[in-house]
From Swiss-Prot:
GO molecular function: UDP-N-acetyl-D-glucosamine:N-acetylmuramoyl-L-alanyl-D-glutamyl-meso-2,6-diaminopimelyl-D-alanyl-D-alanine-diphosphoundecaprenol 4-beta-N-acetylglucosaminlytransferase activity; undecaprenyldiphospho-muramoylpentapeptide beta-N-acetylglucosaminyltransferase activity
Catalyses which reaction(s): di-trans,octa-cis-undecaprenyl diphospho-N-acetyl-alpha-D-muramoyl-L-alanyl-D-glutamyl-meso-2,6-diaminopimeloyl-D-alanyl-D-alanine + UDP-N-acetyl-alpha-D-glucosamine = di-trans,octa-cis-undecaprenyl diphospho-[N-acetyl-alpha-D-glucosaminyl-(1->4)]-N-acetyl-alpha-D-muramoyl-L-alanyl-D-glutamyl-meso-2,6-diaminopimeloyl-D-alanyl-D-alanine + UDP + H(+)
Family under the similarity heading: Belongs to the glycosyltransferase 28 family. MurG subfamily.
EC class of the enzyme, as a word: transferase
Pathway(s) where this gene product acts: Cell wall biogenesis; peptidoglycan biosynthesis
Pfam family, one: Glyco_tran_28_C
Protein's UniProt name: UDP-N-acetylglucosamine--N-acetylmuramyl-(pentapeptide) pyrophosphoryl-undecaprenol N-acetylglucosamine transferase
InterPro entries: GlcNAc_MurG (IPR006009), Glyco_trans_28_C (IPR007235), GlycoTrans_28_N (IPR004276)
Amino acid sequence: MSKERNNLLIAASGTGGHIFPALAVSKEVEKYWNMHWLGVEKRLDSKFVPRKYNLLTLNLETPQKSIFILFQYLKILYSTFNIIKILKEKKINLVFTTGGFISAPTILAAKLLNIPVIIHESNLIPGTVTKYFGFLCEFVLIGFKDTNAYLKNCKTIFTGTPLRPEFYKTNPLPEWVPRGKGPLLIVMGGSQGAKRINEIFYESLDLLIKQNFRIVHIVGEHNINIPRKIKSNNYVQKKFTNQIASLMQNCDLVISRSGAGTINELIQTKKPSILVPYPNSKNNHQEKNAIILSSIGGAILINQDKISKVFFQETLKRIFKVKKNKGKPTYEILDLMKENMKNLTSLKSTNKIKNLINYFLKEF
């Protein structure tokens, strides 16, 4: 029988950048708490959140145009009252959230009921909810030390960003990945894919395959439109995979967006990368994230409006230029990027956050 007053609500929805850190934490604390998950209808939540977590969803979306600002506030207000009912019904004792639109009404509802909230901010530049609602939270956990400068009115704790458990153990290369001697590239655009990266990369494929690159291309759920069928034993395309940890650990180079989750996965796996920040990210936070790696020589940062077929081909040619070292061929620039990545320290963030959450468990 579950104990009274040991109920944890996780509020996380939308993109993998919000959901995956929350999942990593939930797996660490699930044996101590009765788990409940608050998300948004028709989003990634239903695909990744385990059924045992009692997934609750709201019909809540984020209008993108300024004309809908009033509508946004009305939706937040309406959702706040719905969440108050949920918090009371489930007897929630603590809320953990990772930001995003679902977080705002959840924080307000919890505050009105005097329920403590812990929010985690993965990005270097805080998101809107963290920036304006963080002061209402018991703690704001930050993924990067420098984020503290933007949250002067909040009780911040530097924890790093939690990663899924598989990133902390050695994983073999999946059987479906092309075998061979050529360098292995992982091309991906985050949980939602990246249409522009896909389009430009398709244009470069013929030459890259001829140059003996092995390629795993994660195109995203809504970016599967291929201009032509690509036939090669060295190329595999998938909408999505849950084996990202294994792919990143065993690849030579990652080509990706620069969400906070991806940045921390690259730091953990020590992999060099080409980063193309999402141009419409709020406060340009993806570019700021990418600079963390490019500034130490572990990544090459290129803005989306600058990428082209020529850029991909010339950049990869430069990174994988062979230099003989005592008779043994090496990739001089790639090896240098790998060494630079080793200078970054990865944190066991999930354990830190687990201890903070369980501190509140002891108080009940």
